[in-house]
Amino acid sequence: MVCGESNAAAISAKYVDNDPLQRPAARATPANESHICDLMPPKGWKKDAQGNYPTTSYIKEQEKLTVDDLLFPRSIITSLAKDAVHQAVQTAEQDPRVMLSKDASLALQRSSTVFVNHLLMHARQIAQSNDRKSCSGEDVLKALDQIGLAGFESVVRERVVEYEKEVQRRRAEKTPAADEGQAEEGDAADEEEGSHKRAKLDEH
């Protein structure tokens, strides 16, 4: 009787192994688990506006970024540096010609990028402490004080005021031009309407 039961159990087990429908669901293997982990974003990644995590390809692209990819344009940094030195030289009544070597331009490019990101990090912390998502100009000025550069606050304020005045001046110059364009379009429309009215009168 025992032998019969053991034989029946063996036959049943063989039948289950040969029939895919009777096989129990296989547990995820470590390889499958690692594959699932690869699909999940690293800790700290946030969802986008659609509620999706960054794709694996996007994460890999971010991992491939180097310091050179994050640097400010060298031409702009060099131009700003030359303007600053040019103003200082003119004040001292010296030769206004300014020459920057390749190494000097590279040093300015790298240092300016690091400085701005360091300053912005402190400005963001100040904004977050006030329950704000975006940084304001005052946050940046307070950040200057936090990193020990409070002496530049007055200079930055002056530059901001100059920039705002320049923006307003350019807007004021564009507004009359836009008004003139609208006036010309209105005159053309009036002339066209008048010609249509004259044509109708002639028909009558």
Curated annotation (Swiss-Prot):
What's a BP term from Gene Ontology annotated to this protein? Answer: heterochromatin formation
**Primary localization:** nucleus
Spell out the CDD domains in the cross-references: HFD_POLE3_DPB4
What does the UniProt entry say about where the protein is found?
Nucleus
InterPro entries per the UniProt record, alphabetical: CBFA_NFYB_domain, DNA_Pol-Epsilon_Subunit, Histone-fold
Query: What keywords tag this UniProt record?
Result: DNA replication, Nucleus
Q: Among its keywords, does the record have Nucleus?
A: yes
Disulfide topology: none
Against SUPFAM superfamilies, the record matches this protein to:
Histone-fold
Record PANTHER family: DNA POLYMERASE EPSILON SUBUNIT 3
Misc. remarks from the entry:
In eukaryotes there are five DNA polymerases: alpha, beta, gamma, delta, and epsilon which are responsible for different reactions of DNA synthesis.
What is this protein's name?
DNA polymerase epsilon subunit D
Q: Which organism is it from?
A: Eremothecium gossypii (strain ATCC 10895 / CBS 109.51 / FGSC 9923 / NRRL Y-1056) (Yeast)
Classification of source organism: Eukaryota, Fungi, Dikarya, Ascomycota, Saccharomycotina
Q: Which gene encodes it?
A: DPB4
